[in-house]
Amino acid sequence: MKKDYSIIVGGAAGQGSRKAGLIISKIFKKLGYFVYIYDDYQSLIKGGHNFSQIRISDEFIAGRREKIDLLIAFDKKTIDLHEGMLNTGGALIFNKNKTPEEKGIGIEADAIVKHLQGKPIMANTAMIGGFLKVVGIEWAAAKTVLEKEFGGKDNINMTIAKEAYDSLKELIKIESNKKTKNPEYLMTGNEASALGAAKAGLDIYYAYPMTPASGLLHYFAEHEKELGVLTIQPENEIAVANEAVGSAYTGQRTMVASSSGGFALMSEVISFTAMAEIPVLFVNSQRMGPATGVPTYSGQSDLLFSINPGPGDFEKFVAAPANSEEAAIWSGKLLNLAWQYQTPAILLLDKELSEGTFSVNKSIFKDIKKEKELTWNKKGEYGRYKITEDGVSPLAYPGTKNAIIKASSYEHNERGLTEEENEGVITAMQEKRLRKFEEMRKIADSSDSIKVYGNKKSKIAIVSWGFTAGAVREVAEKMGLKFIQPIVVSPFPVKQMTKALQGSEQIILVESNALGQLGTIMASHGIYADKKILKYSSRPFSIEELEDRISKAIKA
């Protein structure tokens, strides 16, 4: 029998519900479960309502359910908002000192903390300890995780958690899951993207904080020395992009990240990198727009903008992973591809992927390596934009003997000198870059640019991308349907998509935007969806919602 549990940990901003949810998730990871965490929070420092929805399973998961099995409430508002989500037989665990009139499993969290002379915030530790007892997790199994989180066995948090644990009785038993070897890490999409790029030789990371991309900056800053990546926060997004270009010009592998509006500020610089053939990896972690939109919530409405982010004809690599493993793999791939083809590359994330936490296999990082770019052999006169058969010119960097290295946003000749009069030179340089683009399209149409799951013989094909693809994959597999997930969205892998769709009599597209933007891209290549399932409320699809809407689309 499949093991699948959903838990909500909720409270006001500042009460520590998010941290508590992460600690609980780490304990379940240690017990052998796949874990997915959906974090929901408002743009507030204190007050309001935050919650983490944790889902654990003995199979890979990447979506949330509408119904839950356990509710851990730090305040009354959490009970009011989420108690109705409990399944029959589900349990409410609450802070009895905050809401004494509630029916459920009350923990004297505040009283325990006061008795042990702890700080008020440590009530969340008491809630964790009580929860562990209620679900039948042995103290010894959780102890090592708690000690690591709290800084040792003698920490007061350990004493608080143990007293709360001992104060309750076991209600249900969540057994350990040791049948298969499950992933070793829990990582957000931001953390995985950072580590993947670092493994591919990233030298410098530039960013100005903007939710939900800020986690990348935090991760690089915290792990700067061990990753060997210099981390810099300039004064705004325009400065971020320009400084990154300057560093890449000198041979330093650079990466920048922002979200939607901040990414928009970088658009002229992205076009500049295409003209100057300077490789930079850009990350756009989408929020629900337009403009400032809904800052701490999600959407997939930047797809068309991300594949057309600046003026002029230029190709770029754009990949949209669905989970943390794919984010790590593709941040590394894109960094290498940017340097191989001397072009901008864009990693397209969204809030749910950037800040969601997923199970990650340690082994994937072994295959992410720095791949060597084409460099000048130091023979003859150096031409930064030398016309070649495949359009890729050898690189040299400032300080190289007998080489003058120019970079300009103007059209130029092979030596990098501005050209406005000679139409032959202008045409030749445009065609040089176009040849490079043709090579890029071949790479984009490789077998790993699209994934196919589920029943590959099904006449019904579901297509989705980015974070939304995770939940859609789960539902499609359950319903016996074919599921197709394009990861590379520019250049669009037409051959691979056409091959994946062979035999399909109905194509259903699922996206978290109002216009069906992937559908627009597919249609531009002669591939049309029969039905579109769209959501643009800033919240992700649930498993139950997808089951219902896909069933209706099939019957319609």
Residue map of PLM features:
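Generic beta-sheet signal
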Residues: 38, 93-95, 107, 257, ...
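Gly-rich Lys/Arg/Thr-decorated short loops/hinges at beta-loop-alpha junctions or inter-strand turns
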Residues: 169-181, 197-201, 221-227, 283-287, ...
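Flexible, low-complexity linker and terminal segments
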Residues: 187-190, 339-556
